[in-house]
């Protein structure tokens, strides 16, 4: 037994060391920075200031200089924007993904080709597809405005990515386009594991397809569906690249990751920015835990 | 041959190799992002390379100046030696002063012929941190053929500009040019918007955000009125998409012939007069208009050349800097690319004026240009600029009135200032 433990440790140690170097040390340093007032101008000159970056006079939360309240401040606004984006985006992607998965589950000619084709939006790197969409959505010489104008659906050209009232929802639309294949694939994998005899019996009994969906399919894929939603939600809460490339990046549409980048990279406040990124991690962790609690997600082997 | 001869041969070869490699240094210069800048810079850097027997390779910086600064600061934090010569924006010396070499001992007084304001801007703590390379001011470009067609003159005030733009825009749209715009400028939330907005605010008499003594002066009604005026253009004479336009996007609309007025930097002239430009020969340039009771003003911009402290070839790099900022090279660049020289007497040069007729009037514009408060706010300038462009963006996007935005901005600037700049 001791021999087996030793062998197990021998196999695990390289991975653990590598993870500590690549993930553990930067994370630890980042958390350490968040407790100091380091600036990028001279990284070695940072002083320890405890939790002042979080709760102090010029901190993230409980800052007395937030003249219009926490939710109108840059940090509060970024939290609100990110959650708005994530919730709408994940719901839409799940519904669309479910539909696409149900379709791809049927047997039809060219099904393999369709399954491969559906993956294309997910496969293109986000920067490339975001730039592409940015050109199509351009207000003066973009394709989308031209097409909508020609079909008479809009009266004059809309500034999709510049107008603050449209910007966030445009980003949601592009994100749904990009990530629906991911959800569809995860749900399809779940659908393929369903036992066929249930459906045979239902067909013999003449059950309505919609009832079949609600009473049989959905409960059976509930667990994988919730897992896919948690994955997507964790991703969506970290959204950065779409907003950065598509929109103008001012404070009203900024996401939490965008705020972190602005503080750390553009303003050079490594201490304050690290505090923001640590808070971001904790917020995402809490959201995931809450979601799994509410969905009563049981990840262990004992099924209901 | 015997071992002694081969030993000698090896020694000679080694000596030759080391002397050859110690002469042919390889420098890296970061000097621009768009194709025209890169081509011009490479040409003159390679000339220097041939003359001195070194090679110069190009490092392409990001297009947005805010991003270029962010990247540069990270490289300085890592003490990277990859960059030798850096093109530095007017507002950067105060921010990156700890990482640049003092050029006074290399320039030997050559800076006396340059614009004093720019040299003063580049001198921090008694050290000359960068040589001025080309000056930039905001200019008003207009379609002189259209102004003639409708019997109008270049506008003297912003109100004139708005009226002229409205008239021509309506007429052109009825005549069939469907997306004709009156006025395009840079409205994206980045440093360029700070430049545009400072022009509006200062020309209305609203001051310069933070004054020379360090007090926050932006919360006044003249500044609020300036921003409200600008917000009134968006959606009427300016497309809503201007909120996402940087320099190239606004130039794209103007160069396609779809705008009457454009506010942009001097580089747009050479590109607008290029052989394949649809508006060649149809553009004019004038100073930006004044606000009511205020005066005409442009934001001072411009780029300088500096040497990184972490470079492995500081002397050679300084030599390259002085070559590129010399009289001959600046004159050639003014003629070929309409880069405004930083040597004052070049503005009276006949050859330059033949190609860029408006440069004669530029001496006054550059001399009276307003600088952004980068020197007084030092390393906190990026945050100050960020807060200012955010506030302006909110007003342009009609999310806040000028007065509300200025009040909020004052609170934010107090937060940035903390106890002192």
Language model segments and positions:
Chain A
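A structural signal for multi-pass alpha-helical bundles of membrane permease subunits
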Residues: 4-304
